[in-house]
Design a protein with these regions (language model features):
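Primary recognition of N-terminal secretory signal peptides and signal-anchoring hydrophobic helices
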Residues: 2-205, 234-248
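Boundary/entry segment of secreted carbohydrate-active catalytic domains
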Residues: 176, 222-269
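Glycan-binding loop/region signatures in secreted carbohydrate-active enzymes
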Residues: 236, 464-577, 609
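Chitinase-like catalytic core of GlcNAc-active glycosidases
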Residues: 249-257, 275, 287-437
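Catalytic domains of carbohydrate-active enzymes, especially glycoside hydrolases
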Residues: 265-289, 345-357, 580-588
């Protein structure tokens, strides 16, 4: 029997030994670090010989550069997103532009030459290359006008970009170790780290620490392999240019003067007769008249001379709204057309001797935002060279108008005007104030996030809207809808485009405030003057009620079964808005438009803008 058990015991022992060896092998496998080195081209996701990895401030970008004939190029979108959004690519005329405080830099695609205004300069390679999708800009040219540093490395091709200046943390390796793609010994090795090799510490952990090397490789090192940390400082040698502005040594008290024909210029004396304290007037003289940047003009030397005799500056307004056949986008997106428009405006300023230009371009699409800002930049240079004040009119800030880039406007223009009115407009689905105090305060506060107070002018209304709610016969059982029209024979509104665009966007997003229930009336409105509002109140024996929420009087009355609602603009409501101007120490105020105000309103205005 014993002899029979010997083979069984031997076999069992062998099995145990095998199992032990298997377990030991498994344990060794589990705790043995991987020696696999990852291909860095795969790590950077490079797919071609021309591809260049971009490492920006210790982050690997999805975007790639291009290595063309030994020069690194970055695509236009990457440049604007990460390095410098002041570059402008004209895809229609294949021209790269950059605007400084004093010069317009330009380079044509595939050219080694570039111009600083009229002075020619050159590099030993093309400055910009273009294809059907975008433009690629030489990195050394970008560096001339941008606050970043770069280092070009090969094997594989990559560029280390730095834009974040200040303190950063480093640590030396206490021993030879490995930099791995992820935190774990089984993660592939990205680089071998020598003893005392210094790395930048990005994120510390108990077991693994995220670091970057001087070669732009980002990964993880065992925390215990690192020595004591130290703080170092990155500094930039870039000298930021200074932008100067024409700033008046008085508070701006400006009023827009709507001029619809040449004969209207002769009314200037009567229009100014009952005003007080006006020091700037903005006549609506110019508008885009074709797709080549030519303008229609209603300018008058006699008008300017009269205003100058009264100590009033003339800032002529240029608009894009009057000629509906003009494609503003076509004008703004061609450098040659912008140049023609600007030259026409400057020539008119010199010819008629007016003091400033007030740009009022409205109803733009977001796609033209960059081109519009480039227009403001280019116009500002010509204005500055000729001592002409440049001001720009803007809607109150919203997500739908962010592309107007008020911060960049303020960098180049002398003044920015926030048109704090048209809160409710001809297309509104509900009756409401033209400019409630909350709307004004919010508009000013949000604009001040981008525009310095000493450059911001508050635009205020001299008009109000009369809303009428006419009952609808609902006996048919048909769905009743709210309809709004603008029976505006007084032509008092500047525009309702921004508000209408915002409403359309709301509806597209499903966030419109319109009610789902049937509204048993049609809604109409028209804008009219302060004096006309007072007549309506008196004629209908209406009782104004002060609204603290709106910062103005509210009136409601009925006539022939129709309900009328008015949020009154008068001295009381205007004073609330002027307090906002004063409290925020703004550059001044402006009013739309002359002729709609009560003469007594000026006594209130000069209390705050003297």
């Amino acid at each position: 029997m014993k002899k029979k058990f010997v083979p069984i015991l031997a076999a069992g022992a062998l099995i145990v030994v095998i199992i032990c060896f298997m377990l030991l092998g498994s344990i060794i496998e589990k705790y043995t670090p991987s020696k696999e080195h990852m291909n860095l081209s795969d790590y950077y996701n490079l797919s071609g010989e021309q591809d260049v990895a971009l490492i920006l401030d210790n982050q690997i970008l999805d975007a790639k550069g291009k290595l063309l004939n030994g020069t690194v190029y970055l695509d236009y979108e990457t440049v604007c997103s990460y390095l410098n959004d002041r570059f402008y690519w004209d895809h229609n005329e294949n021209k790269l532009l950059y605007t400084t405080a004093t010069d317009l830099i330009s380079a044509d695609a595939d050219s080694t030459s570039y111009y600083v205004t009229k002075d020619s300069h050159s590099l030993d390679h093309p400055i910009v290359k273009a294809d059907a999708q975008t433009a690629y800009i030489a990195i050394d040219f970008l560096k001339l006008y941008s606050d970043f540093s770069y280092e070009v490395l090969d094997s594989p091709n990559r560029v280390i970009l730095t834009t974040a200046w200040g303190d950063y943390t480093t640590a030396p390796a206490k021993q030879k170790t490995q930099l791995r793609q992820k935190g774990g010994i089984k993660s592939p090795i990205l680089a071998d780290i020598g003893k005392n090799m210094e790395v930048t510490v990005l994120e510390t952990g108990d077991t693994w620490t995220k670091v970057s090397t001087a070669e732009g490789i980002i990964g993880y090192i065992k925390s215990k392999a690192l020595g004591a940390t130290s703080t170092k400082t990155l500094t930039s040698d870039y000298v930021a240019e200074e932008f100067t502005h024409i700033k008046k040594d008085f508070k701006i008290n400006m009023a827009w003067h709507q001029i619809t024909n040449a004969d209207a210029n002769t009314t200037i004396a009567s229009v100014l007769q009952n005003t007080k304290g006006i020091n700037v007037i903005s006549p609506t003289w110019f508008y885009l008249n074709d797709n080549n940047g030519n303008i229609a003009s209603l300018a008058s030397s006699d008008y300017v001379n009269y205003c100058h005799q009264k100590g009033i500056e003339v800032w002529a307004l240029v608009s894009n709204l009057e000629n509906k056949d003009v494609d503003t986008t076509s004008v703004l997106t061609y450098t040659s057309k912008r140049e023609n428009l600007i030259n026409n405006l400057i020539s008119a300023a010199i010819q008629y001797n007016f003091d400033g230009i007030n740009v009022d371009f409205e109803a733009l699409s977001s796609e033209v935002g960059d081109s519009y800002i480039q227009f403001i930049r280019e116009l500002s240079l010509k204005c500055a060279n000729n001592g002409i004040v440049l001001s720009v009119d803007d809607y109150v800030p919203s997500s739908f108008t962010a592309f107007y880039n008020r911060a960049e406007q303020a960098t180049f223009a002398d003044y920015v005007v926030v048109m704090a009115y048209d809160e409710h407009y001809a297309g509104s689905e509900e009756a409401g104030s033209v400019a409630s105090i909350g709307f004004v305060k919010e508009g000013v506060a949000n604009t001040l996030k981008e525009v310095p107070a000493d450059q911001l002018i508050l635009g205020m209304p001299f008009y109000a809207r009369v809303w009428s709610e006419t009952p609808v016969d609902d006996t048919t059982g048909a769905d009743s809808t709210t309809q709004t029209s603008d029976n505006n024979n007084n032509d008092t509104d500047e525009t309702d485009n921004a508000a209408a665009d915002a409403q359309a966007a709301d509806e597209a997003a499903g966030t419109s405030d319109s009610a789902d229930s049937y509204q048993l009336f049609t809604l109409d409105s028209y804008a009219t003057s302060m004096s006309e509002i007072q007549k309506l109140i008196s004629t209908n024996a209406a009782e104004p009620v002060w609204s603290d929420i709106d910062g103005q009087y509210y009136v409601q009355y009925e006539n022939n079964g129709i309900t009328y609602k008015i949020w009154v603009e008068d001295a009381a409501s205007l004073e609330e808005k002027l307090k906002v101007l004063q409290e925020n120490q703004l550059a001044g105020g402006s009013f739309w438009k002359l002729g709609l105000e009560l003469p007594s309103i000026w006594d209130t205005i000069i209390k705050y803008i003297n």
